[in-house]
Every structure is written in C-alpha cells, then in structure tokens.
Amino acid sequence: MPSGSKSKKKKSKSKGGVKKHAVEKVAPPIEAEIMDERDESDYPTSRVIKRGPNGDVIVESLPDKSTSGKKSKKKGKLSDLEVSESAKQMGITLDSHWESLSPDEKKNILRIEKEEVLEIIRNYQNDHNCSCSVCGRRHMAMNQEMERMYNLLYELEEQRDPDMNPVKFHLGIIKELQISKNKQILDQTEGPNDNTTHEEVVKNFLSSDIADKLKEEVHQFKQKQLSKQECNRPSSLANDNIEEEIPCAQIPQANEEAMTKDIQKTLEQLSVVEPVSKINVIQEDDLGEIKEENKEYLKFTESFISSQPKIAQKFIQKLDENPCMKAITDEVMQNSSYEFLDALKNLWAPNLLKIVESEDDDNLVNLNETLDPIEFTTMLHHGNPLSQQDYYDLQGAISRKVVNAFNFENRKLEHLSPLEVELFGRFMSSDQDNIFHNMLLEAYNERFKEEPFKMMSNIPQIIKAVATLTNLDGRMMDDVDENHFTSEEERYDDDITDYSDSEYEDYDSEYDDIDNGDIISDVDEPFSTLKSDQLRVNYDTNSGNINHSDNYESNSRLREVTDENEENLQYDTPQEKYNYSDHGKDHGTIADEDEDSIDEGYESSIDDMERLEEGRRLIQIAITKLLQGRIMESYHEKEADSNRLKLLKELEEEQMKKKEKEVKKIKKKEKEKEKRRLQQLAKEEEKRKKEEEERSAREEQERREMERREAQRKKVEEAKRKKDEERRRKLEEQRKREEQQEKQRKAKEEQKRKREEEKKKKEELERQLREEELMKKKEEEERLLREKERAEILKKETELAMSMKENHSSQSLSIQNQFFSNPQNSNIGMQNYFNNDLDNTNAGLGNGGPTNLGVRKNSHVLGLTQVYSDKANNSPGKNDDNNEINNEILNIINAATTAKSGSRTSMDMQALLQPPFTDNVNDQIRSSNLINDQASGMNSNGLSTNFHSPYGSNVFSGENQLSNNLQNDILTGLNADTSSTNLASWTSLPALNNLNANQHILSNNQTPLHQQKGTSPISNTMMDTKRDYLGDELSKLTTMLTTNSLNESPAFSSSNLQSSLWNDQNSSGKTPLGSNTTQIPLSQPAFLGTEPPVHRSSIWGDSSASMFNFSQRLSVPTNSNSVSSQTVPNQNIGMGSSFTNPSIWSTGSDFNVPSRDMNSGVAFTNSFSNTSPRNQFALNSGSMLQNQSQRQNIMDNIRLLSNSPQNNGYIPIDLLYQSINKQSTSDFPSFLNNVIDLERSHNYDLVKDQTGVINGVRVGSENRPVSTAFSNFHQNMDPTMKGPEHLSNSIPGTARNFEGNSYLAKEATMNIIPSSSLDR
C-alpha cells in the first residue's frame, strides 16, 4: 500500500467536500533530464523512428526546446544503477506474480486469437493516423494487407504442421522472438561490456549527424507539401505533446535497438510460460479449477457489486446460467475499461491541435504553454498556483462532473459550464493524462458499480456527448471506433473454452528442454532496463481501482517501441513517409495521384519476402503488447486485491480498536455509574438512619407527651367525678324536699277539691230537679198534640191502604220515576210524609199499644207514599194540607233546635241522660239571652246546659272559651231555616223519637231520674276531676270536628271505638248492661259475629256508671203502653244495636239495650218506632242537594279571599264564615263539616293551633273532583236499608214501592252521623 494513502484519507475527511473514492495524493515522480545542445532543431516531433543495421526498430528521443527549460527545473537525474536495480526488482516481482497465478489465469493470459491481434493493429493505425478519405482507404488497404500476411504466415506454418491452430501459431511466433533474444544475449556476452556499449549508444543517439539528417528530411517535407497541406498530423503531434507535458521522468537515453530486443525477448519468454504452466494445470483436478474460478468471481463481485455474501453467491449463479454475462464479467475483470480512457484521449488530443495554423516551432511551443492546465489553473486562481493536493482534487471533481452529467436517455451531457468543459479539455491534453484517466475510470466505475454490464456499452455515447458539447470537428468522431466499445458479448462470440487442453499437448515435447530457471531469467532480463517508477502501481484504497500514474512511462515506452516498428514497416523509404504525411484539410484532386505514387513506391521498394517479414514482426509486436497488457493487468489486479485486503484488514483493526475503545469507555462509564450509585446508596442509607433516629426521638417525645396528658386527664376526670357526685347528692336532697312539699300541696288540694265537688254535686242536684219539673210540663203538652195528629194520620192511612194494594205495580214505578226526575219535589213530599208519620206513630203509641204498631207503621208508610205521590200529580188541594202539616212539624223542630242551641259544659252531658226538657224550658231559653243568662241556664263553670254538639261533646266549652261574637254567629246559624241548612246534622229522626218516647214515659207516670238519685247517684270523684281534663277534652273535641265528613259513609273501627279519648281506658271495654249491647256501624249488617266495645256516651265520668244509671232509669216498670223487645226487631232498624245517639233530642244512651242484666224481662224499645229510616229520610232528603250548593259557595269564597294580596293564600276561619253568612245563613258546625270535606276532596290545607283548633284555610295544590251525594250510595248502604223487608209481612207490595226511597234514606242517615266523630 502506498505511503501516502493514509494521509490522503485523513485530508479527504477533513475537507468533507471530496468523495471517498477521490484519487489519493500521489507524490510527484522523479524525472530524468536530458540536455539537448541542438537548439536549432525544427523537427516538430519529439522522437525519431528508424531501422537499425540488423533490421531492428530504433527509437531516438529529441526533447523539445520549450520543454527543456521546464525539465531543467525538475529534480536531478536518476542514476543508471538505480534504473537497473528497479528493473531487476520489477522482474523478480513479475516472476513471482506469474508463479502465483492459477492455471486458469495463465491459460487466459496466453490464449490469443487472430482477431485480437488484428484488432490491436487496426486500433493503432486508427489512433495514429488522420480520418480523411485517403487515409481511410489507406487504412483499409493496410488492414487487408495485414490480414493477408497473417493468413499467408498461418498457411506456411500449417504446411509445416498440419495440426496448427491460431493459438499454437501465436505461441510459435513468441518462441521465435524468444530464440532471437537468447541469441542476442549470447552475442552481447561475447562483445564489449554493457557500460561501454551503453555509452556508445547514447553517443550515437546524441550525434549531430542523425539530427541533421532528420532535419533535412523535415524541411523537404515542408517545402513539397506547403501548398497542398490542409491538415496536420494530429495524431503524432498530439502524442508527442502529451508525452512532453506529462510530469514524469523521461525515458533514459539508451540503445533503442537493444531495448527493442529486450522487449521482444520478454514477450517471447512470457509466451513460453503458458504451455509449461498448462502442462501442470492439466494434471490438476477439475474441481479445483472450478473452485478457483468461483473464488475469483466472488472477489470481483464483493469488490464491484456487493459485499454481502448472499448477493455475491446469487450473482455467481447467474453467471453460470448466462454465458454472455460471464464473458462480459471476464472482460471487465481483465481490462478494467481502459478503452474508455483511450477513447477520451484520442477524442481530445486532435481537437486541441486544430487551432494551430502555422508549422513553426514557436507556435508549437506557444500551443503547449497555452494547453498547460497548471498554468491555466494558476491564472484562474489570480496568479497563485494551486497546491498539488488541490490540483488533484480539482481533477477528481471535473472527472466526476463529466461522468455524472451524461444522460443516457437523450445521449447528452447536461449541466456542464463552459469553464468545466475547458478544464476537462486541458486535463485530457496534459502530460498527466494517465492520472486524469484514472480519475475518470474511478468516477465511471462508481456510477456504474450497481450495473457493471452497462459500463462498456456506454463509453461511445459519453464520448459522442463530450464531442458534441465541445463542438469537435466531425472528422474526429470518425476516429472513434464504436465497434471497439461494443458489448463483450460480440467480442467473445467464440468462447475461448472451446480449446481443450489437448491443444497444448503438441507443445510438451517442444518445450521440455526449457528450464524453469531459464524462463525466469528470460523474464527478468527484459525488465531490467525499466525504472521502478515506471512499473510501480498505485491503488485507490477506497474504490479498489488501479492507479496507473507511476507506470505511465513504461506504457509509453512500450507504445513508442510499437509505433516505431509500425512506422519502420510502413515508411522504409522517405517517399513512403512523404506520401503518408502529405495530407491536408482539403486533399483536392491530388488524392488519386498520392495513392498511385504510394502504390508504385510500395511495390518498387519492398519485395514480398521483406513485406512478409515486416508483417511477422508487426504481429510479434501486437502479441507482445497484448501479453504485456494482460500480465500487467493481472499484476495490478492482484496488487489491488492485496491492497484492498490490507485496507480491509486495517479497517477491521481500526474498527476493533474503536470497539475496544468504546468498550473501555462503556466499562469506565459503568464503573463511574456504579461508583455514583454506591455513593448515592451510602448517602441514602445515612439519610435513612438519620431520619430513623429523628423519628424514634420524635416518637419518644410524643409518647412522653401522651403519658403526661393522660395523667393530667385522669386528674381532671377525678376532680370532675367528685364534683358530679357532690352535685348529684345535693340534687337528690333537693328532690326529696320538693317531693315532700308536693305531697303536702296535693293533700291540701285534694281536700279542697273534695269540698268543691260536694258543693257542685249539691248544686247540680238542685238544678236537675228544677229541669225535670220544666221538662215534665213540656212533654205533657207535646204528647197531647202528637196524639191528636197521630189520630188524623191513622184515619188517612186506613183509607189509602186499599187503593195502594190495587195499584201496586204502576204506583211503584211512578214514584221511582218522579223521584229521580225531580228530586227536590220528592224530597219535600217525603219530608212531609215523615213529619206526618211522626205524629201518627206517636198517636198510635198513645192509643193503640204494641200490638198494632207494626201494622200502623207499614200502612202509614205505604199510604203516605201514595198520598204524596197522588198529591204531586193530581190534587193540589191535598198538597196544601200536607204542606200545612209539614210546616207545623218543622216549626216544632226549629223551636226545639233554637231552645237547645246554647253551649253547655261537659258536666251537662249527664243531664242528657235524664228525661228531656219540657216546652216551657225551651220557651224560656228561646226568650232569654243564651250567652248572658247564667242564673237559670248556666252551671257553675259558666257554660250553657242547653247546647249539645251532635258529636257527643261541647264545641265551645272549656276555660279557653270563644268570644261572644263567634258564639252569636254560631247561634244565628243554628236558628236558620232548615230548608237552606243541613238540619240533619243537628236534628235527626232518632232525636224526635227519643223526645216522643220520653214524653210517653213521663206521661205514664215514670219516676224521674232525679228521684232515683238515691239508687244510682253520680260519682263525686268524676265531678271533682273535670277541671283537670277540661283542656285535653277541648283539644280532642276540636280535632274530631276537623276530620268530620258528611258525604262519606261512617266506617267504625273496633280499635277506634275502644281507644276512647274522653273516658278512662279501664272502662272503655266494659258492657254496662250486658253482652248484647254492641255497636254495629251503619255500613255493615245488623248482626255480626263480633261484639265491638260499647261507645261511651259521656266524656266526663265512667261510662259504666252512666250506662248503669241509664239502665236503671229505663228499667222502671211501665204500663200497658210499654212495648216489648220483640215488637220491632233489631234487624229492621237502620242503626246499629248499640249505637250511641249524639242528637240533642236523645238521652245520650242506646235505645236497643235489653234489660237482661236488670232481670226485669222488659226492654225499652219504643224508641225504635220513631227511628226508622223513613223518618230519617224525611228530614234529611231536603238538605242533601243543598250541601253541594253550600260547598260550592265555600269554594267560591275561598278563591275570592285567597286572591287578595293581603291574605296571600291564607284565609282565617272566622273571616270565611262571616263571608258565607252574608250570602246564605248556615250554622257553624255544618260549615266546619263542609270545610273539612272540601279539605279532603279539593286538597285544601287547614291551619290548626297547638290544641287542634282550626284557625284558617290555606289553598293547596290542584283541587280534586267533588264527590256527589250519590257517589258511594249503594256500596256504603247498610244491608238492612236495601229493602223494606220488615214491611212486607204486614202490607203486601210495599217493599217494592219503598225500594227507591230507602236509598235516599240511607244516604241521609250516613250524613247525620259522621264517621270521624264516632272513630274519635
């Protein structure tokens, strides 16, 4: 590997702008200088070719004047000893290289074909002659002549040897050259020594006679051709100038004849090696040949195609399959595309000389100076010469630019500037063209390294493109033989492998006597005269291409020898030279004359034998040139491979060093990292220990603090516990003292209460005596009046009984239709009917007795229904009579209601169990002020004894009594007309019946209740404790009133009845008079399996005591007017058997209580004669439809008042009641019932205070639809009310007539007693 490769690599890296494959820096070669004393020489060339005495070609160099001054500046001469030593060393190197070649490689080198020899001769002629038509014909003649001579020689050899073939023929010619060389060596050993001979040769070469002779010949040539010359000798001048411009060592002046002989001897020796080597190759195994061949292809593939083994193997397989590819690859491997360089050289060299117009030596000197690229680059660099490295870099850049600028599609060079074209021409014409050629080859191979088969075929196109771009003369393009650059497939159509090894068997005996040592010595001798610089080979380490810069002189010397031989053969006489050089730009009409003169001279001067000998020598020169190129190429390839392997090895070593260095760096980094990690771990461990110590100290401090706090907390708790114990002790003592004081206070209060109770009992007894006397008088008067009315009604019933039997069916249907078509008229008629029935029934009781009660009652119902039905349809006069009767009954009821409208206390409820009042008492109450008259109508608590709530309690009682204005409003509502108010809620049929029953009992001289006080007196304890429970009773009473509803059927619950709010729980479940005294709700059958507890009739005392008191009162023996318990059964009654009537007309007790507990055998049952559903319907049917109007009136007032901004949705109850009374008179209980019902049906909110009293109404969410009076009529009706079965036994057909009216009676009965009042 050259010493400058590493430095070149480093410099190319530092610059960065140069590619890897740039030409390495080459040291300037040592040049020899030859001093020429003949300055007057006018010969335009740098050499003289002539024949020696023995017929050998002699070449004499004549350095030009213009170049002598430059060369004098070069370094000193090389000594002859050094040249000889280098030649010997090169010979030894080539000998060892030849021995190292494989048999196949030797065979390929020695295999020479006829066409190859002729091709070399033709190419030489084309390269060194002009392209005119005359020369073209001359070339054709020469080619034909050379081929004829070759064939003649081959025929002569074939006559000697019948088995002659082209290869054997060529080897024989080389053998002749070897024999002549050996003979010449023997002659030289017998003559003078080498030094004296060499001096003589140099002296003869530099003699003035030879130079004068050549000068005269040149002057004669110029004088004869001055007027005719149109073209110069571009080939000769170009070659001469190029050689002179090359900055290489000049060829030493030596004996040219001896040098020629040496070259011939070398070629002969090289030609002999092939058969000897081949003999050894034949004996080897064929498998080894295949392997060696594959190895060579593998190396080539890895170098030029791809370094990957898989791709290389595939390429080798393709070569085996395609012979054409294999042939092309072999050509590329052997020639390395030197044709490309030669073509470019031949293209540019003539073009550079076309500017020459004169043939003076001064012009040639000026031309050479102008074409010098160094001076041109110095001029471009502002007079500063470029360094050698910069000069080489510029050449590499221009070479790559030219190759890369070639476009293979349009066959043109693109993107080249004029300066680049000028530099390219100057580099091609310089004496360093081999260096530039190598750069071009390198750039060319680099571009086509992926497609190596396109390399040779593209060379002609690139050359044409360069010629077109630089405007070359068209004649110069004719010199480019494209056939020379055709694909290797056409050049190797005849496969060289057709020759078998048997071809060389004939030569074995012929060359057996040749010793290997002789061959080596023969090979060494011809190269002994060459300098080491001429044979040194440099390689581009990056691309693997051969650099021929240093061995250019050897190639030039061999080429000169060849040229001289050819010229001597062609121009033995001056006339021939004159004829050849007599060319110009325009041959004109003398072309034919020149041709004739050439032919005449040729025939006259040389005979056939001499011409044949010259042809043999020319063939020897061609074969020598071919072998020389092959051997040198093989040597260069091997050196390139070795250098490449060395480079790869160095690269691998460098890579290994880099890797080792990187590994060391990585290990060092890892060690540092590990060290830092250990340090970090140590720091973390130290920090952790420190934190652990701090944490333990902190925990210890916290533990001590907790202990201290715990001790302090225990002390505080102990002190607190002692204080608490002391405080509890004091509180216990204080509580005991207070209990003792409380006991003493209660004892005093109990004594005081007992005294007050005794006083009240005494006053009460006195008051009751007075009331009994008044009631007795009133009852007597009423009884007489009822007996009179009853007698009249009985008479009418008897007359109507027969007519009703006949018209039973039609009358029943008529009654039902009229009732549902006009409910108001029907209600009036029914009301009148029941009013009359009340008097008739009472009269019947007074006259008839219990036997005819049932008949009278049934006939009364049927007759009265028929009468009112007929009156409504036919007789207006009778309707007037009935209206008078109805008005009388209503007056009586209004009088009774007005008399009993006052408020009373809870103590007065016991008075309701006594016999009823008389008319005188009622008159007295009606005529007096009910609020202020406390002397006759008030008890000791200031409450009226006459007004009783229909719910069994006082509405306006208690210490928190309502104002006088509100009481007056209530009394005013109670005195209103029954036709416009809900009278049934305050006066009911049972009340009237109880009134009549009580009058009947009094009329039969029954003992009053106040006369039986000794037997069952009122408990003094109950009278004493009434004040304590007065507030609770009022709150419970208010809650009961707010939940009443008149339109819903009563739903009694045994649990509600048992949990009484007004009496003791111990007495709530007792039956005062026996087990049969049970309560049954109106909505259930009369006879049930269960026996609910008795509903209390008193809110103050024990229910058992009051019931016992009442039973004693009922158990008094009666006269014949008394009615037995079997006269009217319980199942025919609309009420329950043990229902407590809350009406103000009743005594507050049950009316169906048997007397079994009293053992009297007689029960008080006459009240049932007046409590039938017909009587109830008569009083309530008129007010059923009016409830709807009252509710609608309330709703309208609520809406009106709620829209007022000052009310904001809230309406006080007293304001609402006053607003209602302005439009229609209504009593306050009925008003409350309607408000409560609207609260349920229309989602109104009732505002109550803490005691449950209703204070106002607040409008709620969207109202629900209002339920009608007949919505749940049939479902809630008592089974005993669904039909008058009790009437069917006495009067046939009455049940069907009464069916429609019984429903209305049921609804009226349900509206009389609200369910909520009973539940509470």
Curated annotation (Swiss-Prot):
The keyword Protease does not apply. Residues 637-807 form a coiled coil. Belongs to the NST1 family. Signal peptide: none annotated. Keywords: Coiled coil, Cytoplasm, Stress response. It comes from Candida glabrata (strain ATCC 2001 / BCRC 20586 / JCM 3761 / NBRC 0622 / NRRL Y-65 / CBS 138). One of its GO terms (cellular component) is microtubule cytoskeleton. This is Stress response protein NST1. Residues 33-42 have a biased composition (Acidic residues). It is found in: Cytoplasm.
